[in-house]
A protein has these predicted regions:
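Detector for the mature cores of small, proteolytically processed
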Residues: 3-18, 39-126
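DNA replication sliding-clamp ring fold and its partner-interaction surfaces
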Residues: 21-35
């Protein structure tokens, strides 16, 4: 086994552990599909590779709310897409990818829950 394969395996295991304590891209899509398309949800925008873990996904939180259907479209577009890491590299986002709330290039908070009306629950990384 090469050193790179070993490191990749460790990174994948750490990502699986993170996905147990916060929403994943697949879970957000599932939650949004259960909310009426015209419902207002948190104004999460600009999906990007998360600064803390480049293979995780982050959204910037903007003021106000947006339609659930618009956020759902952004989430579906991120599925399977490769994002450039903050210091380089390309990272493909998938169903089990943990999601964070953070500005580009910054660390942020874990997304725990997304609700109609614009509320989200977040938590800090351990």
């Amino acid at each position: 086994m090469s050193i790179q394969a070993f490191i990749d395996g460790m990174n994948a295991q750490m990502q699986r552990e993170r996905s147990k304590t916060q929403m994943t891209l697949g879970q957000i899509i599932e939650a949004l599909e259960g909310i009426p398309a015209d419902a207002q949800v948190a104004n999460l925008r600009g999906p990007h590779s998360y600064r803390g873990y480049y293979d995780d996904l982050a959204f910037k939180r903007s003021e106000g709310t947006r339609y659930a259907s618009d956020l759902l479209a952004d989430c579906k577009a991120a599925m399977g897409k490769a994002f450039e890491g903050y210091k380089g590299g390309r990272y493909v986002m998938g169903e089990m990818t943990p999601v964070w709330i953070a500005d580009y290039g910054c660390c942020g908070v874990k997304l725990i829950a997304l609700r109609a009306g614009g509320d989200i629950d977040v938590d800090y990384d351990d």
